[in-house]
A protein has these predicted regions:
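Sec-dependent N-terminal signal peptides
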Residues: 16-21
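Domain-level detector of nuclease and nuclease-like folds
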Residues: 114-224
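Bacterial signal peptide processing site
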Residues: 27-30
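C-terminal motif of bacterial Sec signal peptides marking the signal peptidase cleavage site
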Residues: 23-25
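Intrinsically disordered, low-complexity proline-rich regions
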Residues: 8-11, 83, 158
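Bacterial N-terminal signal peptides that target proteins for export
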Residues: 1-14
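Cell wall/extracellular polymer interaction/catalysis modules
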Residues: 36-114, 130, 139
């Protein structure tokens, strides 16, 4: 997808996607300190996600053989010396302290500051928290991002609506798998996970393969 087309796609779908994410309890990073556990997606968000999923092209994936992690860059710097990872740790945690250089911390006298939504694992050490791309980088390449330029890849890599603070075990288990091959062991998060996943695919003009589509349908069926 060319730069102009991707920009137009992002602009035209941003309002819809942000509304879906907000209703699903998957807010973009804002500097707030929400509860550690994501809120269940509302029926309105689930309905919107089903409509977005129905609009996604269903086709066989690229092999992804041309994927190179180095092509996607690293976390970008934001205000007050914070990078994207540090912002996600701050925004998706509870009771998080911010030290010199925007270094997040978790005081010993409070409950663990993070709970991995994929497996309900409580986490206290910020170094042990990993940041997952809900739609994996390699999955993006397999489903339409092969021709993106560096700016487009960097934007996707740092998009907070696609980032989740999780346990190392959950992140390793998931790897670059899509919902046709992997789903969170915590079934309570399936609805919110699928809702946000579909929104990201729609925002970036990506496709889904048949198994991935069916996996998303199954997860959205858990929405109440």
């Amino acid at each position: 997808m060319g730069a102009t087309r991707l920009t137009n796609t992002l602009t035209s779908t941003l309002t819809t996607v942000l509304a879906v994410l907000a209703l699903a309890g998957c807010q973009p990073a804002t500097g707030a300190t929400p509860d550690t556990a994501p809120q269940p997606a509302t029926p309105v968000a689930a309905s919107a996600a089903r409509n977005l999923l129905a609009a996604l092209p269903v086709r066989a994936e690229d092999t992804g053989a041309h994927y190179r992690r180095a092509d996607w860059g690293d976390w970008t710097q934001h205000g007050r010396g914070c990078d994207t990872r540090e912002q996600v740790l701050r925004d998706q945690g509870r009771g998080v302290t911010v030290g010199a250089g925007c270094r997040p911390g978790c005081p010993a006298n409070v409950a663990p500051c993070w709970v991995s939504p994929y497996d309900n694992t409580p986490l206290r050490d910020p170094v042990a928290v990993q940041i997952d791309h809900r739609v994996p980088l390699k999955e993006a390449v397999r489903s339409g991002a092969r021709t993106w330029n560096q700016q487009q890849r960097q934007r996707f890599y740092n998009d907070p609506t696609n980032l989740v603070a999780v346990s190392a075990h959950a992140n390793t288990s998931k790897g670059d798998k899509d919902p046709g091959r992997w789903r969170p062991s915590n079934h309570a998060t399936w609805c919110a996970y699928a809702t946000a996943y579909v929104a990201t695919k729609h925002t970036y003009g990506l496709t889904v393969d048949p198994a991935e589509h069916d996996g998303l349908v199954s997860m959205l069926a858990t929405c109440r």
